[in-house]
Every structure is written in structure tokens, then in C-alpha cells.
Amino acid sequence: MRLLTDKLMLVGLFVFTLAEALTHYGQVYPDSPGYFAAAHFFQSRATPAGQPDFRLLRPVIPLLASLLNYFLNIRTSFAIVNLVFWCAGAILMFYFTKLLTNNLYAPLFSSLVFTSAIPMLLFADAALTDMGGYFFILLCIYLVIKWDIPRATITRVCVVALVLGVGILVRESVACALIFAVTWTLWSTRSVTRAATLFLIPLAISLGWSYAVGISYAAWYTQGGVAYAAAKQPLTPLHKLLRLAGNIQYSFGRYPEILLLGALGLWRNHEKNSLRIHISIWVGAFAIIFAWPVIDTRFTFILFPSVFPLAGLGLEEVYRIVFRTKYIQETWPSFTDSVISQYAFLLFVVAAYALITNVVLRHYVSLPWMPYTDPSVKLSSIA
């Protein structure tokens, strides 16, 4: 019965994700032409988008898009690659939450709000690398927990390290999963060998690629991070902290309901190892958030592997507080507390959340036959 329920939930999740993806499809933003150029670089041909420059430090998505580009136009190629990662990421979020919480309702809630979150609607299927980064963050953390990497064989540790290395070549923010893996390993078993393996293999992969293409991560950090922040976000430390707090809240919704549910879920969660996992995720995520000089929802959203599962636990606690009180039993005697009523409450909350995020981003609706292009992007650069 549980297996059938999971299958039905996964079908519903896939349909919902596809609906969100096809109404926020293939957006082109000011950064996109650089990724088009990176894709054309792998085809060894010139491009009207210009030089790929630092985007070559994120080669995986452009490489995959370049393969599809032999059959489809470049914009559609990126859209399809990211659409696959979006659907796979939503399903992985379901299984990850199930692994982390062992809860009946949290996996569905977590994966549904993940797929309708503001950064997902804005960037997941855009001609960028964000969705690939979110997928690999989730995949790496899932594997670390599933295989209990602090106590796993060295073979499994090496496999996870290789996946981390590939993930960092998708997007540098995947390094938050590396920091999580090292932190949790040292905290749980103090295994220096495993921690060193998890750190050194991804480092060798990323630096090896950097050397091969002749582009420095330090130069990218200086130009794309420090210089950009100085020009576009000249803030005092206090204002930067306030902006960061607001940005984290906005990453998870127009209003702070998801963060409040997450806080409630954390308060309810008393399992020691689970708390270690969440704290290790926060260490990794905030290390990247604070290290990158630019404040952006695309980076603050990397807290999602902790926030959404906790919010799922928090929602169940809200249901218990609201619908299992003596007051409800006395004033609403016909109400039946059942699995169906709990799922109905969950879907109501998800529908309200998705409605708000979609209304907030109504000007960014992007359909396959009428995709959104930022006004600052010249159509000649999309080729």
C-alpha cells in the first residue's frame, strides 16, 4: 500500500513539475549568451554570443547542450537539458526527504514546494547552470547520507568524491555539498582519511580543468564576485547582513511561511544524528553564501536541502496543533482526522504557496512557443 501511495505521489509530482517547467521554459537572461558561447566552444566554432570566458569553469551543462545543438537550436538545447535536471531534481528531493525524515507526508510537501520555489521558477530552466547545480548539491548530499559516508568503504567515498568533482564543474556552489560531507565526516567519526579523500579528489578535478582551459578560479572570483559586488552592491556590513536575511527569506517564498515551518520542524526534531546532518548542511551552505561577495537568491537558495524537509515536518506539526485539538473536536464534530485529511491540508498549503510564487513572477512566464528574453539581451546573440 505504501509503495502504491509513493508511486501515485511521484506521478503527481512529475506532472506538477512539468507544468511549472513548461510555463517557465528556456528563459534567456544577461548571463545566458556567455553559456551559449561556452556550448559553441565545445563545437569548435565561432559564436555571435562572444567569448565564453569564465563560463568555461562550468562546462558540464554547456557541453550537454552543445550535443543537442547539433539537432536543435541552442536555446532549446539548454531548456531540454535543464528540464531533465528539474524533473530529476524534484523526484530526488522526494527520496532525499524520505531518507532524512522517515516521514509519510514531508517528502511530498518538500518536493512540491521545491519545484515551485521562486529561484526554481526564475532560473531552473533558464539558459544557465543553476538547475544543474541544485541537482548535484542534492545528489551529493543524498549519497553522503544514504551511504553513511563517515563509515563507508573507501570505494564509496571515492565515488562520492568523483560526483562532487563533476558537480563543481557544473557550478561552483556544489562546493557546499563538499563542505557538508567533510564536516559531517569529521564530526561523526573524525576520519581524516575519508575527509581528505572527499576534499582532495574534487579539488584535483576542478583545478585540473581550470589548468586545462587556462582560466583561473581566483580571477573569476575577483571579476565576477568582488568587482561586481563593489560596483552593484556597495553596502555597509550591517546593510549587507540585512539584505542577506531578506534574500534568504525571499528565496523560499514571498512571505516567510516556509522558514517558519522549517523552524517548527527543527524544534520538533530531537534525533541527534539528524541535527548533526542539518547543522553540517548549514555550515556548507553559509560558507559559500558568505564567501561569495554578491548577495543573490541563486546562492541563498542552496539552503534548500535542509529547509524544505524541516518545513515538511513543521507542516505536520501545524496540522496536529490545529486539527487535533479539543476545540476542533467540539466545534467541528463531523471532521474526520485521517490520512486523506492530512494530504488535503498539505495540498491546500502547497496550492497557496505555488499560487503566490507564480503570481509574484507572473511577468516571467515563459512558454515553449513564446519564451522570455531579458530586454537587455540582443536576439543576435541567441544562435
Label every model-predicted segment:
Residues 250-287, 308, 324, 328:
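Hydrophobic, aromatic-rich transmembrane alpha-helices
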Residues 80-101, 139:
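Transmembrane-helix motifs of polytopic, lipid-linked glycan transferases
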Residues 13, 107-116, 142, 164, ...:
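Short helix- or helix-capping micro-motifs
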Residues 2-4, 151-154, 189-197, 262-281, ...:
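Membrane-interface helix-loop-helix junctions at transmembrane boundaries of multi-pass membrane enzymes
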Residues 93-116, 134-135:
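Transmembrane-helix signature of polytopic, membrane-embedded enzymes
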Residues 34, 190-264, 353-366:
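Membrane-lumen/periplasm interface segments of specific transmembrane helices
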Residues 33-43, 51-73:
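Short hydrophobic/aromatic helix or loop-helix immediately within or flanking a transmembrane segment
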Residues 29, 122-132, 296-297:
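Short acidic/glycine- and proline-prone juxtamembrane loop motifs at membrane-interface regions
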